[in-house]
Amino acid sequence: MILKKDMSTENDIYQEIRPYNDAEIAPAIQRLIDDEEFISAILSHKFSHLPALLRGLVSPLVKMFLKNRWGKLDSVDAVQIEVEKYLDKALDTTSDGVTFEGLDKLDKNTSYLFISNHRDIAMDPALVNYGLHHSQHQTMRIAIGDNLLRKPCATELMKINKSFIVKRSAKAPREMMKALGLLSSYIKHSLETSNSIWIAQKEGRAKDGNDFTDPAIIKMIQLEGRKRKMAFSEYVKSLKIVPVAISYEYDPCDLAKANELYQKATQGEYQKSEFEDIESIVKGITATKAEFK
């Protein structure tokens, strides 16, 4: 894996949204191991067949396992290698293979803005990173919505895995413009410091399979270009945009997506349960997907 230097924390205007750097990895992992909600979530997923009392007795063993497995991770690249091991296992057990096209057209010494269709919350960027890594490219920084970060442990997990935060919760016009301006600036900053970026072509997954790029994404990206007084065409060219199309033979979340569309069509709205997005992430990783392309 190609190593890159971390961004300095001095005068770090992006600290609130950026992923963790090397110096922040080990403390973040320790916070995860000490987070009872995180441990409880693992117990509920891995040991759901056990009574609650017995799951509690297993908790110290889970912490010991995590400490042994993750305790030596002290850099962004070390985390990426560990994530690849989990992804290898997931792909071996839930898919019939992955086919990549176009990676040979990319320059290993160039940073790109990957704009992708969106089928699965976690697997979409994970698959692109998987292809990049196995082609000796640097892995990307990943844009994620703050709607996925309702728990501190979720924030820790995402930020140790090169994810930066898109503040979808910002609603007031001034707050929204400030958040979008910072996001646009961070994307350009990342590209200029040799870090590729992954971002979905529109907010949320395309639950009906209709892939199109939301003009709001392009407007957001261009905010930094306007600030620099660059022509639209000149600025977009400087971003080195790479369109990405991902297809799944089977979508593990297809029934949930269909139900959401049905509820919106018949009731006019759909209310997500508190942990529905997290459940979708887990199902997307662990359920059968057959072939990817």
PLM region spans:
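Membrane-anchoring hydrophobic helices of lipid-metabolizing enzymes
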Residues: 2-112, 118-129, 133, 155, ...
